Structures are given as structure tokens and as C-alpha cells.
Amino acid sequence: RALPPHCRRQRQMCIRDSSDTSPEISDIVDLYQDELMLFERYHIEDQIKKALDRKVWLPSGGHLIIDRTEALTVIDVNTGKFVGKNSLEETVYENNLEAAEEIARQLRLRDIGGSIVIDFIDMESTKKQQSLLNRFKQELAKDKTRTQVFEISRLGLVEMTRKNVAAGLVESFSEECEKCNGRGLIIN
């Protein structure tokens, strides 16, 4: 029951640190037997913490800020340390392309669903804007979960929806702060 459906469909091998495995899935579940704890060996806790962080670094030095609210998820793209080798417009375009790929990955990884607004870095060229949107749609096509992407708004925002399939990663690994009631700040 707890085995992810994609593991059953794709016949991937799963590792378990307990020997009590249901007979119907025993052919795709290996028992992990090592002195080093499973989470330690594969740095799973570090990976989960990284996947829950609101700041996601891009390989070039730019970064994403991912904020979840009750109404929607907002993703802000920033150049950060990325200065590029070409014109400012080309640097921004390259950063946005890299961000488009990573945003699609983060949506899958974090299982983010519902309404999503993305604030890519502003670009003057409508040709580059359309190219970015096409690239983003290509990256989203790798996702088995249904998505819908709308045109870039007059404010330069990309609005999209992604079907809610289950509780996302943040919801699965967190609880509301008792001190601030989930606001993220305490009023003095």
C-alpha cells in the first residue's frame, strides 16, 4: 500500500530496511542489509531538507524562491551570482531557460499542485519570451501529472495549473508552527 504506484508500474527496485514485506511485492523490494543506516548511506535526510528548502540554487549561480500559500504557489526566478558572458538580455534568457528546466523538476519532486505563478526574469524580446514558454512546456511534458500553462501575462508572469494528486512534499514532512500559526512571522 505504501509502495509508490510508479514503482509498481515501472518495475523499479525498491529498498526496505525491514524484513516484513508483503508477498505480492517481494519481487520488487530488496532488503537493505548494511551496518550503516539506510538514511545515512544515501544521505536521505539531507536530500529531504534540500527538497523542502524554499531557495533552490541553479547550476549557473541563479536561484529560485518557492513559496507556498493556501491559494497558490509562487516561484520567483533570480539571477543571483549568474552574470553570463553575453549581453544582459542573453544572460537573463539563459538563466530563465535553466530555471524553466529546474521549475519543472521541482514541481514533480515536491508534488506541487493547484495554481502556480512563476515570475521569470523580465525579457524585452517577445521571441525569447515565446522560446522560454515553449521550452518550459517541453520540460513539463516529462511530467505524468496533467498541467496547463497559460501565455505570459502583461506583468511578465506565467500562470499555470498542475493537478493535485496527493499531499505535496512540504505537507507530508511539516506541520503548522504553533507560535506563528503558519504565517512565518510573529507580530510584536
What do the PLM-derived regions correspond to, one by one?
Residues 8-9, 24-35, 146-154, 187-188:
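Interdomain boundary/hinge elements
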Residues 20-21:
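Predominantly extracellular/luminal regions of secreted and cell-surface proteins
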Residues 26-64:
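A contiguous, basic/glycine-rich beta-loop/short-helix subdomain that forms a polymer-engagement track
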